[in-house]
Amino acid sequence: MAVSLWQQCIGRLQDELSAQQFSMWIRPLQAEMDGDTLVLYAPNRFVLDWVRDKYINIINQFFTEQMGNDAPKLRFDIGSRPSAKKPEPAPVAAVRVPNPQTKASVGTSFNTTEPVVNANHRSNINPTYQFDNFVEGKSNQLGKAAALQVAENPGGAYNPLFLYGGTGLGKTHLLHAVGNGIIKNNPNAKVVYMHSERFVQDMVKALQNNAIEEFKRYYRSVDALFIDDIQFFANKDRSQEEFFHTFNALLEGNHQIILTSDRYPKEIDGVEDRLKSRFGWGLTVAIEPPELETRVAILMRKAQESGINLPDEVAFFIAKRLRSNVRELEGALNRVIANANFTGRPITIDFVREALRDLLALQEKLVTIDNIQKTVAEYYKIKMADMLSKRRSRSVARPRQVAMALSKELTNQSLPEIGDAFGGRDHTTVLHACRKIAQLREESHDIKEDYANLIRTLSS
């Protein structure tokens, strides 16, 4: 009875949680009775701890309401329920691929004179990108959690997994980390990572060589296919057609697909609706620009890997001024380290100011409160004067709060200074706005998207 009630409990959780929260934390759970105990099996420790910390009260309350004193005890475990049957792995077709000794990436040639062999598909997975060296923060926590689950249960956890966000935020790192995780668990797994333009080039070459069937067999035989920057499929009708059928074939065989893009699937122009619809079949997760604490952690990790002692105050100084993406942070730190090695000077705040003076000057020039106000007003189609007015209607107040939150995150101005710039408001008003927008970014997909879009615009 308890197991059947678990299905009803799932229904309640689905009603109370966002679609992403439900897909991420509840859908992977499996339930089975063990005596008078209901055992909930999670795919990994991360999911187990999260569900136990965040949702245990809701689950207990549901069973108490339904069964009273007869409610089962709850226990959490990692893995699959013992009675769950594991499907037999699908047979992998033999395919013709390029000689792995050549410099070309896997899948770049379809010469029909080459022998038919089983492909070494994983030669383009970068072994340096691991979960252990991926710096986690609130901005990428869900993305990493989803990627971990896919690595442990490819084709079963979230399929497809769609990661989206701006350039240099770690999407590619996660793709390779998943690939390395899959290969660690199954050394014979056939995993392919590539940029979407490589898929297009392979298809064009196959058409030129009358080897399109070879192309199809190759891509439909892999255990996992990871394609970066899927937005480059835009307006390439034949490539979209081939990928559509490849996508369907892989999903039907329970083979894992992970895609990345710089924008939400439905916002990708020039891509067929049937593809965009399929992109959302599994789990879609945003990777956002790192918050201050994560930026500091990234700098400290990079410095440690480089054998450099980076003082905390220097890391905070850099992190507060460079906010757009991880790549920019690492590039700035590399410049600081190179200058320090060349001059023999210690790394201090004054030294960093000198080493990064052009970059810091550009950032200060680009991101000002006035610039933020104008950008937000234009984005929400309100008047610039509304940013300074006392109007409280939501159509005006919400954009104003967004602009205040962005001003706190993207400038070095204090709360009182931000309040002055918004019509002489008190610093507590600014603090309330920042907290409100932080809350809404957790609860509202629209606000989350708006905020991410504005940061990309202001940081570009």
Curated annotation (Swiss-Prot):
SMART domains, per database record: AAA, Bac_DnaA_C
Annotated region described as Domain I, interacts with DnaA modulators, given as residue ranges: 1-84
Role this protein plays: Plays an essential role in the initiation and regulation of chromosomal replication. ATP-DnaA binds to the origin of replication (oriC) to initiate formation of the DNA replication initiation complex once per cell cycle. Binds the DnaA box (a 9 base pair repeat at the origin) and separates the double-stranded (ds)DNA. Forms a right-handed helical filament on oriC DNA; dsDNA binds to the exterior of the filament while single-stranded (ss)DNA is stabiized in the filament's interior.
UniProtKB keywords: ATP-binding, Cytoplasm, DNA replication, DNA-binding, Lipid-binding, Nucleotide-binding
Subcellular localization(s) per the UniProt record: Cytoplasm
Region (Domain III, AAA+ region): 124-340
Gene name for this UniProt entry: dnaA
A GO MF label: lipid binding
Protein name: Chromosomal replication initiator protein DnaA
Entry binding sites for ATP: G168, G170, K171, T172
Organism: Shewanella sp. (strain MR-7)
Key word Glycoprotein present: no
